[in-house]
A protein has these predicted regions:
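N-terminal domain-onset segments
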Residues: 1-64
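Low-complexity intrinsically disordered segments
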Residues: 65-154
Length: 154
Protein backbone atom coordinates (compact mmCIF):
# COMPACT_ATOMS: atom_id res chain seq x y z
CA UNK A 1 0.00 0.00 0.00
CA UNK A 2 2.84 2.43 0.76
CA UNK A 3 4.25 2.01 -2.74
CA UNK A 4 0.85 2.74 -4.32
CA UNK A 5 0.43 5.75 -2.01
CA UNK A 6 3.82 7.06 -3.18
CA UNK A 7 2.85 6.67 -6.84
CA UNK A 8 -0.50 8.36 -6.19
CA UNK A 9 0.99 11.28 -4.27
CA UNK A 10 3.56 12.06 -6.97
CA UNK A 11 0.89 11.80 -9.68
CA UNK A 12 -1.39 14.16 -7.76
CA UNK A 13 1.41 16.74 -7.43
CA UNK A 14 1.96 16.63 -11.20
CA UNK A 15 -1.76 17.00 -11.93
CA UNK A 16 -2.13 19.97 -9.57
CA UNK A 17 0.79 21.67 -11.33
CA UNK A 18 -0.82 20.99 -14.71
CA UNK A 19 -4.14 22.42 -13.53
CA UNK A 20 -2.37 25.56 -12.30
CA UNK A 21 -0.59 26.01 -15.65
CA UNK A 22 -3.80 25.38 -17.60
CA UNK A 23 -5.70 27.97 -15.56
CA UNK A 24 -2.96 30.55 -16.20
CA UNK A 25 -3.47 29.89 -19.92
CA UNK A 26 -7.27 29.94 -19.57
CA UNK A 27 -7.67 26.31 -20.63
CA UNK A 28 -9.00 23.08 -19.13
CA UNK A 29 -7.26 19.80 -18.37
CA UNK A 30 -8.76 16.51 -19.54
CA UNK A 31 -9.08 13.50 -17.24
CA UNK A 32 -5.70 11.84 -16.89
CA UNK A 33 -4.90 8.16 -16.43
CA UNK A 34 -1.52 6.83 -15.31
CA UNK A 35 -0.79 3.14 -15.85
CA UNK A 36 1.99 1.48 -13.90
CA UNK A 37 3.61 -1.78 -14.93
CA UNK A 38 6.10 -3.37 -12.55
CA UNK A 39 8.43 -5.76 -14.31
CA UNK A 40 10.31 -8.54 -12.55
CA UNK A 41 14.03 -7.82 -12.53
CA UNK A 42 13.61 -4.08 -13.19
CA UNK A 43 14.46 -1.53 -10.51
CA UNK A 44 11.80 0.95 -11.57
CA UNK A 45 8.29 0.50 -12.91
CA UNK A 46 7.14 1.64 -16.32
CA UNK A 47 4.78 4.63 -16.23
CA UNK A 48 2.39 5.62 -19.01
CA UNK A 49 0.26 8.71 -18.64
CA UNK A 50 -2.67 9.23 -20.96
CA UNK A 51 -5.05 12.13 -21.40
CA UNK A 52 -8.61 10.92 -21.90
CA UNK A 53 -10.08 13.12 -24.63
CA UNK A 54 -13.38 14.84 -23.95
CA UNK A 55 -15.34 15.68 -27.10
CA UNK A 56 -15.73 19.40 -27.68
CA UNK A 57 -18.92 20.84 -26.22
CA UNK A 58 -19.56 17.97 -23.80
CA UNK A 59 -18.00 19.63 -20.78
CA UNK A 60 -17.07 16.27 -19.29
CA UNK A 61 -17.58 12.53 -19.37
CA UNK A 62 -19.89 10.63 -17.04
CA UNK A 63 -18.30 8.23 -14.54
CA UNK A 64 -19.85 5.30 -16.44
CA UNK A 65 -18.29 6.40 -19.74
CA UNK A 66 -14.89 6.96 -18.09
CA UNK A 67 -15.11 3.59 -16.35
CA UNK A 68 -15.88 1.85 -19.64
CA UNK A 69 -12.97 3.53 -21.46
CA UNK A 70 -10.54 2.67 -18.66
CA UNK A 71 -11.85 -0.89 -18.36
CA UNK A 72 -11.26 -1.59 -22.06
CA UNK A 73 -7.76 -0.11 -21.88
CA UNK A 74 -6.90 -2.10 -18.73
CA UNK A 75 -8.14 -5.33 -20.31
CA UNK A 76 -5.65 -4.87 -23.16
CA UNK A 77 -2.65 -3.52 -21.20
CA UNK A 78 -3.09 -5.37 -17.86
CA UNK A 79 -1.49 -2.69 -15.62
CA UNK A 80 -0.37 -3.41 -12.07
CA UNK A 81 -1.74 -0.09 -10.87
CA UNK A 82 -3.98 2.65 -12.27
CA UNK A 83 -4.19 6.27 -11.14
CA UNK A 84 -6.93 8.62 -12.32
CA UNK A 85 -7.28 12.38 -11.86
CA UNK A 86 -10.09 14.56 -13.09
CA UNK A 87 -11.75 17.85 -12.34
CA UNK A 88 -15.42 18.11 -11.46
CA UNK A 89 -17.80 20.90 -10.64
CA UNK A 90 -19.97 20.59 -7.55
CA UNK A 91 -22.56 22.92 -6.00
CA UNK A 92 -19.72 24.30 -3.87
CA UNK A 93 -17.29 24.83 -6.77
CA UNK A 94 -14.48 22.98 -8.48
CA UNK A 95 -12.81 19.87 -7.06
CA UNK A 96 -9.90 17.69 -8.07
CA UNK A 97 -10.84 14.03 -7.77
CA UNK A 98 -8.22 11.30 -7.82
CA UNK A 99 -8.42 7.53 -7.54
CA UNK A 100 -5.76 4.89 -7.12
CA UNK A 101 -6.26 1.15 -7.62
CA UNK A 102 -3.84 -1.76 -7.84
CA UNK A 103 -4.26 -5.37 -8.89
CA UNK A 104 -3.83 -6.58 -5.30
CA UNK A 105 -6.90 -4.67 -4.15
CA UNK A 106 -5.49 -1.43 -2.72
CA UNK A 107 -8.06 1.30 -3.37
CA UNK A 108 -7.66 4.97 -2.47
CA UNK A 109 -9.71 8.09 -3.14
CA UNK A 110 -8.88 11.82 -2.92
CA UNK A 111 -10.99 14.94 -3.31
CA UNK A 112 -9.71 18.50 -2.98
CA UNK A 113 -11.64 21.70 -3.63
CA UNK A 114 -10.05 24.66 -5.34
CA UNK A 115 -10.93 28.12 -6.56
CA UNK A 116 -9.66 30.09 -9.51
CA UNK A 117 -9.30 33.86 -9.19
CA UNK A 118 -7.69 35.86 -11.97
CA UNK A 119 -6.23 32.64 -13.37
CA UNK A 120 -4.63 31.78 -10.03
CA UNK A 121 -5.52 28.47 -8.33
CA UNK A 122 -6.02 28.41 -4.57
CA UNK A 123 -6.17 24.86 -3.20
CA UNK A 124 -8.49 24.08 -0.30
CA UNK A 125 -7.92 21.39 2.28
CA UNK A 126 -8.44 17.84 0.98
CA UNK A 127 -11.80 16.34 1.94
CA UNK A 128 -11.44 13.75 4.75
CA UNK A 129 -7.80 14.76 5.24
CA UNK A 130 -6.39 13.37 1.99
CA UNK A 131 -6.08 9.86 0.57
CA UNK A 132 -8.65 7.55 2.09
CA UNK A 133 -10.12 4.09 1.63
CA UNK A 134 -13.42 4.47 -0.24
CA UNK A 135 -14.90 1.46 1.57
CA UNK A 136 -17.88 0.03 -0.28
CA UNK A 137 -18.13 3.10 -2.54
CA UNK A 138 -17.64 2.19 -6.17
CA UNK A 139 -14.74 3.91 -7.90
CA UNK A 140 -14.29 4.61 -11.60
CA UNK A 141 -11.10 2.51 -11.63
CA UNK A 142 -12.74 -0.59 -10.12
CA UNK A 143 -13.94 -1.81 -13.52
CA UNK A 144 -10.33 -1.83 -14.74
CA UNK A 145 -9.59 -4.68 -12.33
CA UNK A 146 -12.85 -6.60 -12.44
CA UNK A 147 -12.07 -10.31 -12.19
CA UNK A 148 -8.33 -9.74 -11.73
CA UNK A 149 -8.16 -9.53 -7.94
CA UNK A 150 -8.79 -13.22 -7.35
CA UNK A 151 -6.18 -14.22 -9.92
CA UNK A 152 -3.59 -11.80 -8.49
CA UNK A 153 -3.86 -13.18 -4.96
CA UNK A 154 -3.54 -16.88 -5.83
Amino acid sequence: MERVLGFATRFLEEVRGDIERARMEGSDTPPRLRCIHERAGHATPEFRTLNIPVPSGLGGLSPDVLSGIISRYAEQKRPDCLLLALEAETDDGMVLIAESRCKYGTRMFWMQPYTVTDRHVAWGEPVSGGWRDPGAEEMILDAGFAGRLAAATR
